[in-house]
UniProtKB/Swiss-Prot annotation:
One of its GO terms (molecular function) is structural constituent of cell wall. The keyword Nucleotide-binding does not apply. It comes from Saccharomyces cerevisiae (strain ATCC 204508 / S288c) (Baker's yeast). Pfam families: SRP1_TIP1. This is Seripauperin-19.
Length: 124
């Protein structure tokens, strides 16, 4: 015989798991919410690997970055409002323009989007 407390505990655990699951949203890759998540990961990556970014910048002096990104890197407060309004194509260019995009940034961005319940779809 199964005890009622076991059933109640199981139901509570299932309910907690359902409640903890984030709602999902499918957005265009150029949606500003997607861009903000991408830029948040990018800024965090720059902070964690600053020397590597400096070396990349020295080797590619014509690669420019929006001033908002530099400000966000060195402002350790809430920087998300600084990053709004950067055009999607510029976000894509700076993020995919580094050699470690595929190995480090893309997986981190995918993880951050998934954690926020955001999935991207190419518009038809």
């Amino acid at each position: 015989m199964v005890k009622l407390t076991s059933i109640a505990a199981g139901v509570a655990a299932i309910a907690a798991g359902v409640a903890a699951a984030p709602a999902t949203t499918t957005l265009s890759p150029s949606d500003e919410r997607v861009n903000l998540v991408e830029l948040g990961v990018y800024v965090s990556d720059i902070r964690a690997h600053l020397a590597q970014y400096y070396l990349f910048q020295a080797a590619h002096p014509t690669e420019t970055y929006p001033v908002e990104i530099a400000e966000a890197v060195f402002n350790y407060g809430d920087f998300t409002t600084m990053l709004t309004g950067i055009p999607a194509e510029q976000v894509t260019r700076v993020i995919t323009g580094v050699p470690w995009y595929s190995t480090r940034l893309r997986p981190a961005i995918s993880s951050a989007l998934s954690k926020d319940g955001i999935y991207t779809a190419i518009p038809k």
